Each structure stands twice: as structure tokens, then as C-alpha cells.
Amino acid sequence: MKLDELAAIRRDLHQIPELGFQEYKTQAYLLNHLAKHPEGRIEIEKWRTGLFVKVKGTAPEKILAYRADMDGLSIREDTGYSFSSVHQDRMHACGHDFHMTIALGIIDHFVRHPVKQDLLFLFQPAEEGPGGAEPMLESDLFKKWEPSMITALHIAPELPVGTIGTKSGLLFANTSELVIELEGKGGHAAYPHLAEDMVVAASSLVTQMQSIVARNVDPLDSAVITIGTITGGSAQNIIAQEARLEGTIRTLSPASMEQVKKRIEAMVRGLETAYQCSGKVSYPAAYYQVCNSSDLVEDFMQFVSENGLAEVVRSKEAMTGEDFGYMLKKYPGFMFWLGVDSPYGLHHAKLQPKEEALETAVRVMTAYFSSKAN
């Protein structure tokens, strides 16, 4: 598939971003494209709003898998593209339009150039939330088509086109959503001594939590606690009865994640005493770390470099989260960054990845799978 064909698909998908488990138009678009392939070369199974697509090998003994996430984000696009999102306040701001396009390009190649082994392509919904990888792994289809290895990529705005980046072991952090709900006794702004101010309580808690990383996490490890939103109160002259804090926790080890959560919960218990309120801590979604299989990823990097398929750089661990980690927890495999050279980063309303990177990714993955599946 040539670059202009890949770009056309990407632009179509870019216009129809949908949130997790709402990817109905996206699924329909993918099915329509896949229907163009000769009957008998591929098998397609729907799974919720996602797809399992198997490209049949000539004499299969195993299955090699590739995963592409599908969902968009709740962001109002500001790219100025002529092919901007037609869904208000929805955008493919994390490159999932790229990821799906690349998967379609790889499928197209192997339909026309069969290899010995079966290739399984997973179009996974809800990576951005509430998380599609775990329920997809638990589906009967994964039992039917169990892979011997699994791979994925993610666009990297900071890397130039023609470059990929990855590493052995830990690549992406453990991540967890965080919600804290506080409830006390509201009242009139003129009588603070008769009320329990949850805005003040929430502010105090945010300040306290800044000490957790500095004093409760191993200095040789890393962790980030970010409170992204605080809501509370209803009017300027009413002391807030309730407050809600939402954020994320990110750590480079499961042990640090457990420690951070314990400290947050202890601080909330202390807050209940100090401010005579009640507090509830919850973690609506959590993603396991992305940990690459060292032997497979080292072999992949060597293969790409020796064959001149792309420039290869060794990445550092990133605090980004990815539910692909659950797939790597169960199956050998790896993930890598794909350079797309955008002046704006992931989850930015002006993210503008260069489409030439589509060709790089398809070239790399078709060559790699050809070497491993024959």
C-alpha cells in the first residue's frame, strides 16, 4: 500500500474519533475496508466495538499478533486540518488513527504476500478508558486464536520520521486513575465556625500529597501524582459541603504504586479527623506497566537496524500509561515508539503527526513479520 493510500485511510479515520466502547463508526469503516480483500484470505470476528482479524498463513504452526488501539479523546481539535474531526469535542489526539491505518497497511501486504504462519490483528477499543485490553484478553476469541507473541507501536511526536525507539524491560509506567470524594457540613460564608469547609480540606490534601513522592517512594524509583481537577462548592457565599479531586498516579514499579496508594488513603483518614469530614478514595481504572520481552525486543532492534529499515534509538522509561501492558503480562512481545515529528505532543489539540511515518511503520513491520512468520 502506497503512502497516498495510507494517508487517505488515516484522514478518513481522523475525522471520526469515538470514545471507548463507542467506536461504532470506526468499526464499520474498518469492516468496509477489510471486505475488499479476497474471500478466504482473512477471518474476521467482531468483539464489542473492536475486531479480531486473522490473516491466514500457508502452513500455520503458530500465530503472531499485532495490536492497534481505536478510540479517540474528549478534546476539541485545533489542527486546522481540512480533514479535522467531524465529531464535536472529540479528537484522535493520541495517534490511534495512525495505529489503525498501519495495521490495515500490514494486513494488505500479507493478504497479497502470504507467509507460513497466521497473523492476528487486534483492533482494540477503549485504550484511553475504561480499558479494553483486559476484557479483550478474557474473550473466547483470544482462547481460539492464542498468539505465541504480540507487538504494538505508539506514535512519538518528539522523534523524527524514520526513527523508532524502544528498550528492553520496562517501557511504560504503571498507571492508576485517582478519585477522592470529601463530604462535610456546609454553611453560610459568614459563619465558618459552624461548618466544615471541604474546599479548604481539599486544598490541604493536595499540598500534603506532594510529600509522598519526596518522602515515601524509593529515590531510585520514580513516581508522579497529579491532581488534574478539583471541584467543590456551589456559590461564592456558601461554604462547600463537598469536594471532589481527580487525578492520576504513575510509578515505575508495582511496589511503589501500592505504597503511594497506601499513603494517600492514610492522608485521607487523617483529613477526616482534622476536618471532621468523610472521605472516599477510589481508583476507577488502572493500567499495568508495559514491560518488553528483552530477547524479542533486542532481536527486533537489531533486525531493523541491520536491514536499514529505520533509525533505532534506545528509549528511556516513560510515565505514560498503556493497557497493552496487560497483553505483555500474558504473552511475550514488545512495544516501540514510532517517530512522527510533531511540534505538539500527545493529547494536544494541535497534534500533527507527519504522515510519512505511516510508510516507515508498515515497512518495518512487514519486513519483521516476514522474517519471523516464514
Swiss-Prot record:
- Describe the reaction catalysed, as an equation: N-acetyl-(2S,6S)-2,6-diaminopimelate + H2O = (2S,6S)-2,6-diaminopimelate + acetate
What this chain does, per the entry, is described as: Catalyzes the conversion of N-acetyl-diaminopimelate to diaminopimelate and acetate.
Record Gene3D superfamilies: 3.30.70.360, Zn peptidases (3.40.630.10)
Q: Which NCBIfam families match?
A: amidohydrolases
Q: Which organism encodes this protein?
A: Bacillus licheniformis (strain ATCC 14580 / DSM 13 / JCM 2505 / CCUG 7422 / NBRC 12200 / NCIMB 9375 / NCTC 10341 / NRRL NRS-1264 / Gibson 46)
A GO biological process of this protein is:
diaminopimelate biosynthetic process
Q: What is this protein called?
A: N-acetyldiaminopimelate deacetylase
Q: What is the similarity comment for this entry?
A: Belongs to the peptidase M20A family. N-acetyldiaminopimelate deacetylase subfamily.
List, from the UniProt record, the residues annotated as the active site of this protein: 69, 128
The EC class name is hydrolase
EC code(s) of this entry: 3.5.1.47
Question: Which keywords has UniProt assigned to this entry?
Answer: Amino-acid biosynthesis, Diaminopimelate biosynthesis, Hydrolase, Lysine biosynthesis
Instruction: Name the source's superkingdom.
Output: Bacteria
Please give the pathway this protein is involved in: Amino-acid biosynthesis; L-lysine biosynthesis via DAP pathway; LL-2,6-diaminopimelate from (S)-tetrahydrodipicolinate (acetylase route): step 3/3
Per the UniProt entry, the signal peptide is: none
Molecular function as annotated in GO: N-acetyldiaminopimelate deacetylase activity
UniProt keyword annotation of Acyltransferase present = no
